[in-house]
Amino acid sequence: MLGKHTKLFFGVSLVALIVSVILAAWGFPKIVSKQIQKNIQIDNSSVMFEKWRKIPMPLTFNVYVFNVTNVEDVNNGAKPRLQQIGPYAYKEYRERTVLGYGDNDTVSYTLKKTFIFDQEASGSLSEDDEVTVIHFSYMAAILTVNDMMPSITGVVNGALEQFFTNLTDPFLRVKVKDLFFDGVYVNCAGNHSALGLVCGKLKADAPQTMRPAGDGNGFYFSMFSHMNRTESGPYEMVRGRENIKELGHIISYKGKSFMKNWGNDMYCGQLNGSDASIFPPIDENNVPGKLYTFEPEVCRSLYASLVGKSSMFNMSAYYYEISSDALASKSANPGNKCYCKKNWSANHDGCLIMGILNLMPCQDAPAIASLPHFYLASEELLEYFDGGISPDKEKHNTYIYLEPVTGVVLKGLRRLQFNIELRNIPMVPQLAKVPTGLFPLLWIEEGAELPDSIIQELRQSHTLLGYVEAVRWALLAIAIVATAISAIAVARSGLLPVWPRNANSVSFILSPHPNSDVNKVH
């Protein structure tokens, strides 16, 4: 009777061991993975959905302005001396409106951003502060004309003197709130013959930074008004219900799956990556070396490179940052050749030097983007200034910390600087003596750090995963011990052969029949 029970115990233990091995190697990981996928996919029933639709905390949107301190000297050919003023801090609220779902596991949506000035974070700075900056809209207009039809530059400049108020030089004295959101008024009601041409082109092109004035006679120029309280998109994004590895991937923007701003080149025109707010979980066995995001402001995808594994809020994270190869010149990265567009100067091939991005094909204005203070850009850009430009990795790089299990962004900052060329044009009085060079207007810092409430949710999830992992291996250990005990019990009961205790005897493996003639000594 005892033997029967022993054999039953052994059989049950063996089955439990097999089941435990299967669960440990495949079952538990699959169950956990499925549950995570269920929670983070973009679905009405998921934990992530409402947080994705309406981000539960404001992002930070900081603006730093380059104030010109030696205007008269620059007007007479001296190097510019700049003073960075900022941050002018804003709270940025984001809300998505779902437009519909596609059959290919996608969701279409628009994104609305709302900016509210944060006086506490801005300290002593005020939106009523007056600064002197490069006249961005004037330089954009005069450069466009000078590149397309140099012979009429002087005539058009006469019209621009009526279009812009007090146009004595290429610098704008302006309140911060007008430069950012409220707008600087420009007048189309003058009597210059070329003014109608200028205003007609503005009405036809409708650049984002120019919005029609209510009086019907002009426009308001501002850098960010088009971003505030307006719907951008629509975007079409993968929901991750069918393939979690594709979660967040943008497959179309404004109905286009390919950005033709850069011609027909597949490398430059493809939409690659997410909108930087959501990423798929990271496979620890195949950690991506690059993290792509689609940036509508520059009409292209950019990537951050993996630096390594780190820690944030006592949780493991992968740290990515913009590296020099992402902003490399054509000579350093031949693949970037398709971003070359002639616009920086009349004699330039449009293949910009290291560290700067051409925005002309994207914004229909000769603007140039870079990292703040020309970080990671060619040092020759720094030689143009007499002071005020000092690139610093800690202050000026773009980076992101990604939690691998859920793909949640623990902390991230996107930094971008807007520049335009200040060009010496002898036929234009305002530009006849100025030195030619790339001139920064301002830079932005946009990002977020998770609030304590969401950090606690993540920590609780990690704790629960730890318990599941412990149970996984505990069950396997118990099954192994039970199987070993039952095997020993069966062996001792004589139901299974065991290793002989006599040191002079031979193993039963080699001698299954100890009494046979094979083992006799002759």
Swiss-Prot record:
Subcellular localization, as worded in the UniProt entry: Cell membrane
UniProt keyword terms in alphabetical order: Cell membrane, Disulfide bond, Glycoprotein, Membrane, Olfaction, Receptor, Sensory transduction, Transmembrane, Transmembrane helix
InterPro entries per record: CD36_fam
Gene Ontology, cellular component aspect: cytoplasm; plasma membrane
Recorded superkingdom: Eukaryota
Matching PANTHER family: SCAVENGER RECEPTOR CLASS B TYPE-1 SR-B1 (PTHR11923), SENSORY NEURON MEMBRANE PROTEIN 1 (PTHR11923:SF69)
Family the UniProt entry places it in: Belongs to the CD36 family.
Protein name: Sensory neuron membrane protein 2
Organism: Ostrinia nubilalis (European corn borer)
